[in-house]
C-alpha cells in the first residue's frame, strides 16, 4: 500500500473513532465553595520537535503532569489558541530594540531562538511592525511569547492544561467541537473523566475516556472538525478539562460548543465556565447520576400562604389520622401521585432537587440534619385514692443545619428547589430552627381527691442573623414551588375543612360534676367569588405544591382550620374540678429577616378539694413568664388559693396577689416560679396539733442590657403550730439569701399563746439601675379552729413600693414593720424600724410595710422583744452560705446508780446562692457570723418519779452557758434553771463576777427523798499538771429564793482574713449527769443555736450571774479534766453531784484556792471519789 494511501486509511479510521456521542451518564458536581469566573490554565514543559509523546493517550490524559510545571494563570474564559511565529507569512509581530521607548511589556512577542533572550525585563518593544524574512526566521526554533493567556513562555513547545466547571443553563445535549488541532488536544467532560468533584487542583486522574480525542497521529495531518456530545442537566456543575500540546512552530486550537437550543458558542465561554477551590471534606459533592433527580413536571412559583396546582392526570391525597381514647397520635402526610412525575417526602442529600411536604421542611443544604418527632403520652389512672399528676409533651420539627442554604428563590443555575409547610425558607449560615409543642393534660378517675392540672404550649422560636427569605422566581427556573399551612384556590362551591381533635376517655358513675371552660380558637377563610389562578406556559405539563391541606380552584368556598381540645375531668370523686383554658401566642425574633410562626397555648388549672381523709398532701405550682419590651408597660399578677380540710375543724386559706409595673428602656425577661407545700397530719386525741408549712418564692430576673435589672430576694417562711393545754413554744425563722447587697436584717419573734400562733418574716429587695416604679402587695390570711372550740385568726399584709432616679449614687432603702396582737385579755402592739444603705451607681428607695394581726379568745400572750442584728458590706455579686447546727441537752437524775444518755443534735444546713448579672459577673463568697448570746429562755418539761408514779411539769427555765479556754482547750458548761418557783428580775448589768444559777438539791433520808430548788453561785478553779488541765466547778446554794438575774454579753469581734469558702460555726452539745442517792428528776430541753457565716468572725462569750445577799458553803462541785492538746470540739463536759462527796470536794476546792502545792493531794481526793 502506498504511503499516502496508508495515511488516508489511518486518518479515516481515526476520525471514525473520535466522532463519538456520549451515551453514558455523565457525573455532575455540586461544589459549595465560592464560585470564581473562568478556568485555570497550567503550563508544563514540552520538548521542542517531539512529535511522538503527544500521540500517546496516556500522556494527554495524565502523563503531562510528570514534566516540569512552568506556572499557571486563572480566570480565563477565552479558551481558543491561535499562535504564529514572527516570520513572513505569519501574523504581525513586534520586534525588540534597545532604542525603543514604547512599552508593550504586557504582550511581548520575541522572534528569537530559545536561549537567546534579547528582550530583558528592562527593554521595550518597538511600536512598528516588522517581519523577518524566511532566511532570517528559523521555523524550527523555540520562540518566547506571552500570547498564550498572557503567560510568558514558549508557545512553540509547551503543554497547556485547562480545568474548570461547565454550568449548563438548560437540560439537553451539548456538543463540543475542535475545528482543527495543531498539534494535539483532548477534551473531557464529567467528574469521572476530567477530574474528581471538588478536587480541581489535584493531580489529573488516569481516565482516557475522552469526550473529544484530538490526538494527532505521528507524521499525519492534523484532525479537523472533531466533535463530542454529552447530555447535561441544568443547574449542575460538570468538570471539564482541555489538554493541548504544541511541539514546534505554530499552534492552533479553536474551541466551541453547541447548546440544546442550537445556539453556538465560540472561543468566549463567559458565563459557562467557573472554578472552585478544592474542598475534599465536603460531603455529597458529586452527583453520579443526575437523571435520578430529574423531574419531567414543571411548576410555576406560588405566593406565600397559598398555593394553586394544575396537574395532568395527577391525584393529590392528604390524610390525617387520630388514635383515641387514651393515647393520641397524629400524623400529617401529603403525597402526590402524578402521571410522569412522582413527589415523595424522602430526600437525598446529594441531589439539588429536594422536596418535602406537610410538617417537615425541605431545602438544599450541605451537612444538614433534619429530624421530626411527634409524641402524645396520655397516662390513665383509675380507682386511685390520691391525685394523679399527668404530663404530656409534644415536640415537632426540629431542624439543625450547618452551613446550609435553603431558599425559595432560584437563579438560572438552579434546576429545582422546593419548600413546603410549617417551615420557612431562608438563606442563612449556621442557622438553627426548632419548633416544639408541649401538651400537659392530666386525667384522674375514681379519685378521692382533686387533681392538679397544668397545661402549657410552647411554640417555635427561630433566631437568624441576616437571613433572607424570598419567594421570587427567575423565568429561567424550570421548577420552583412553595407551599404553606393553608390554601385557597379556585373551585365551584366546595368546602374544605381540616380539623384536629383530641378526645379524652370518660368514666361513668361520677358523684361530682366537672366544670369545664375552654377557649376555642379557629381560623377560617371565606372567599366570595374569588379566583386565584396560576399562569402556566404551554411547556409546563405539571405545576404542584403541597401543604397542610389540599389545593383546589374554587368559587364561593369556605376553608376552615380548627383545633379542639376536650379536657379531662374527675369522675367518682368527692371534689369538683374546675378547669380554665386560655390562649396566648409568641413570635420569632430575627435580625434582618421577616418570618412569623407562632402558636402558644397556656392552660392554668386551679382546683379545690374537700375530703374526710385523715391526712392530705397538696402541692400547687405556678409558673409565669413575662416579657417587657422597650418603652412599654407590662403588668402581671399571680394568684393562688389552697383550701384544706381535715377531720378536725381546721381551715386555712392563703391568697397571694402581686402586681409589678415597669417602664424601662431595654428588654427585661422575668421568670417567676412559686411553689407551696402543705402537710397537715391527723389530730391526736390529746388535741395537740403540729403543723408546718414552707413557702419558698425564688424569683430570678434576667436583663438584656446591663443597665436594667430586677432583683427580688427569695423568702423562706417557716411556721410551727403546737396548740395544747400546756405551755407552747413557737419559733419562726426567716432567712433570705442576698444578691446585690449583703446587709440585711434578721428578726425573730417568740410568742406564747393558749391555742396556736404563727409568725411570718419576709424580706424583699428590688433594685433597678434606671428609672422605674414598682409596687407589690401580699396578703396572708389564715384561720385555725381546734377541736376545743378556740379559734385563732391571723391577718398580715405587706406592701412594697420602690422608686429610683439615676441622678444620685446612693441607695437608702427603709424597711418598716408593724405587728399587732389582740386577745381577750391582753393587747400588745410593737413597731420596729430598721434601715440600711449600700453604694450603687443609681439611687433607689424601697418601702416595705408589713402588718400582721393575731386574734385568740383565751390565754394571755407574752411576747419577747425581737432581736435584730445588721451587717453591712457591699459587693456586686455575692454567694451566701448558711450552716445551722442544733443540739439537744438532757439531764437525768437516777437513784443509786449513774447513767449517761447522750443525745445527738440534728444538723441542718442551708446554702443558697444568687447572682446579679451586669456587663460582667464577678462572684465572691462572703462569710458572716451573726453575734448571738448564749442566754436562752425556754420551756422545759421536768419529769418527777416517786413510788413508780411519774409526773411531768412544764416550767420556764434560764439557760446559762459558761465557756473556759485555757491553752487552746475549751470547756463549756450549760445549765438549765427552772423558774417555776422563783421570780426573776432582769437587770441590765453584771453585778457579780461569780456565776449564779439555780440548782436542785435532792435530799434522801430513810427512803424518802425531797427536792429543793435554790440559787447557787458557781465558782471555777483550774489546775494544770503535766499538761493535763483540771477544771473544778463549785455550786454554792444561797438562802433566799428571790433572785436578781443579770446578764452581760460581751462581744469580741476580730477581723479575720478573707476566705473564699464560707466559715463554719458549730455548737457543741454536752450531757450533764447528776447521780444522787435516791429519787429521780429529769430535765429535758431543746436548744437551737443558729450562726450565720460572714467575712467578720465574731467570738461571743456570755456569762450569767444571779446576785444574792447571803452565800453558803459550797456543796456541789463538778470536775472536768482534759489534756491541753485536746481540741474544743472533742471535749465532753461531765458534771457529778452527790451529797456524800461534798465534804471531799469542799476540802479539795479549799486546797486548790489556798496553795498550788496541794494540787497533788486534791487529785488523790478526787481519785477516791
Swiss-Prot record:
Propeptide span(s): 1147-1169
Region described as Disordered: spans on this chain: 798-837, 856-920, 1070-1107
Subcellular compartments: Secreted, Cell wall; Membrane
First and last residue of the signal peptide: 1-24
Predominant subcellular localization, coarse grouping: secreted
Stretches with biased composition (Low complexity): 798-819, 886-902, 1077-1107
Biased segments, Polar residues type: 856-884, 906-916
Region described as 4 X 36 AA approximate repeats, Ser/Thr-rich: spans on this chain: 384-608
Keyword Metal-binding applies: no
GO BP, sorted A to Z: filamentous growth of a population of unicellular organisms; flocculation; invasive growth in response to glucose limitation
GO MF annotations, alphabetized: D-mannose binding
Modification after translation (UniProt): Extensively O-glycosylated.
Protein function: Cell wall protein that participates directly in adhesive cell-cell interactions during yeast flocculation, a reversible, asexual and Ca(2+)-dependent process in which cells adhere to form aggregates (flocs) consisting of thousands of cells. The lectin-like protein sticks out of the cell wall of flocculent cells and selectively binds mannose residues in the cell walls of adjacent cells. Activity is inhibited by mannose, glucose, maltose and sucrose. Also involved in cell-substrate adhesion, haploid invasive growth and diploid pseudohyphae formation.
Name by which UniProt lists this protein: Flocculation protein FLO10
